[in-house]
């Protein structure tokens, strides 16, 4: 999907780029697969802010996505490619032979009318989902489960792909987009191919208002706050931080590694991601 530029008729138009939505085939979602989505503005169930800089934005409907891909042996035909406001990738509506409809994350190269399949017997073809033990090494994959049957958790955003490197014992070595090499149980499922909407990384938001449409609020620097609000705050006029950079809660920031060394999944990481 290519990006579209505009003539600089105003400062807000000058750098904006948008997707041309060439792959999208319909504008309305499948009603049976849509749910209401209530805005949280970064708050948890206690009403406390757990994610800063969230709030407002355009109203959205949630599209129920099939991340488990557990409809084994039933062929499905791609009916539409659709825009999803809740993720960077596009989604595809699949009509299965038994009459059921499901949304999946649309891989790059998936076309309307194409047939896809799930299960150990599926072919190594873009859009098909198989356990890692049935996928040959070297193949690009996405939508990977961390635990068998729990649904895809990693490599789901636009343009993302991982590579199955090798199989050893009960685990597969997978190189993730970050460069990290991690072990996944061989019974975990993955989808063949790269996530679609590859040009998403080239999109420039271009103006503050467009960020607000997406529900992103401004990020205020700690150094311009008062001491009561941030460890970097205070001082007369423009003053340096005066200490190693920290988060608003006093934890080391800007490059300091914060992963817990005792985390159980650390033993599954063969090689850490590159900086």
Swiss-Prot record:
One of its GO terms (molecular function) is rRNA binding. PROSITE patterns: RIBOSOMAL_L2. GO terms for cellular component: large ribosomal subunit. Residues 225-275 are annotated as: Disordered. InterPro entries: NA-bd_OB-fold, Rib_uL2_dom2, Ribosomal_uL2, Ribosomal_uL2_bac/org-type, Ribosomal_uL2_C, Ribosomal_uL2_CS, Ribosomal_uL2_dom3, Ribosomal_uL2_RNA-bd_dom. Residues 258-275 have a biased composition (Basic residues). One of its GO terms (biological process) is cytoplasmic translation. One of the primary rRNA binding proteins. Required for association of the 30S and 50S subunits to form the 70S ribosome, for tRNA binding and peptide bond formation. It has been suggested to have peptidyltransferase activity; this is somewhat controversial. Makes several contacts with the 16S rRNA in the 70S ribosome. This is Large ribosomal subunit protein uL2. The gene is rplB.
């Amino acid at each position: 999907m290519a990006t579209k530029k505009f003539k600089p008729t105003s400062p807000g138009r000058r750098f904006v780029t948008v997707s041309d939505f060439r792959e999208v085939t319909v504008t309305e979602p499948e009603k049976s697969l849509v749910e209401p989505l209530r805005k949280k503005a970064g708050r948890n169930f206690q009403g406390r802010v757990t994610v800063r800089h969230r709030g407002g934005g355009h109203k959205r409907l949630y599209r129920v996505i099939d991340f488990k891909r557990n409809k084994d042996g039933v062929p499905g035909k791609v009916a539409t490619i659709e825009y999803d406001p809740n993720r960077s990738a596009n989604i595809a509506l699949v009509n299965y032979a038994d009459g059921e409809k499901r949304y999946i994350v649309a891989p790059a190269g998936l076309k309307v009318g194409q047939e896809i399949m799930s299960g150990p017997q599926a072919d190594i073809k873009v859009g098909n989902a198989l356990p890692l033990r049935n996928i040959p090494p070297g193949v690009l994959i996405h939508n990977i489960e961390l635990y068998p049957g729990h649904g895809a958790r990693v490599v789901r955003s636009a343009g993302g792909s991982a590579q199955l490197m090798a199989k050893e014992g009960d685990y597969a070595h997978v190189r993730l987009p970050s460069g990290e090499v991690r072990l996944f149980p061989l019974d975990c499922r993955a989808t063949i191919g790269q996530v679609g909407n590859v040009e998403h990384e080239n999109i420039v938001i271009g103006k503050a208002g467009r960020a607000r449409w997406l529900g992103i609020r401004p990020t205020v620097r700690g150094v311009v706050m008062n001491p009561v609000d941030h460890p970097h705050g205070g001082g007369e006029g423009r003053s340096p931080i005066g200490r190693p950079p920290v988060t608003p809660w006093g934890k080391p920031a800007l490059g300091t590694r914060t992963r817990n060394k005792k985390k159980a999944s650390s033993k599954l990481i063969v090689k850490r991601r590159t900086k």
